Regions:
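Conserved catalytic core of nucleotide polymerization and phosphodiester-bond processing enzymes
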Residues: 1-123
Length: 123
């Protein structure tokens, strides 16, 4: 599950040996490869990546809700970036704190702040 509980499942299995095998649901893999063949979950690297990406998306969405509830309106969100009109740098720093604390984590979450007259001039 992602940080906020979204399910990330890869329920495909393949033999635990180094050769090209077709990944399939567990029951079908047992029938195809036999009961004595050791099976492992297929595509675990994809499952881990999906879990990480889903958690990052959850954190960004939660931060956007918290920003909105603080009285500010996010203009646009792209991947893990949020563009917001602010009065000054201190307002941007407050938004940064909101984003960093949107989801409680054991490892601190850092948020970079860039301010400019337009998105292309932000630094």
């Amino acid at each position: 599950r992602s940080l906020l509980g979204r399910k990330c499942r890869f329920d495909l299995w393949e033999p635990d040996r180094f050769e090209m095998n077709k990944a399939m649901p567990f029951e079908q893999a047992v029938q195809e490869y036999g009961k004595t063949t050791k099976l492992k979950r297929a595509y675990t690297y994809k499952a881990l990546n999906r879990l990480i990406q889903a958690s990052a998306a959850d954190m960004t969405k939660k931060a956007m809700v918290d920003i909105y509830q603080s009285g500010r309106v996010p203009l646009i969100q792209i991947h893990d970036e949020v563009a917001i009109s602010v009065k000054d740098r201190s307002d941007a720093e407050n938004i940064s704190r909101i984003m960093e604390n949107a989801v409680p984590l054991e490892v601190p979450n850092k948020c970079d702040v860039e301010v400019g007259s337009c998105w292309g001039n932000a630094s």
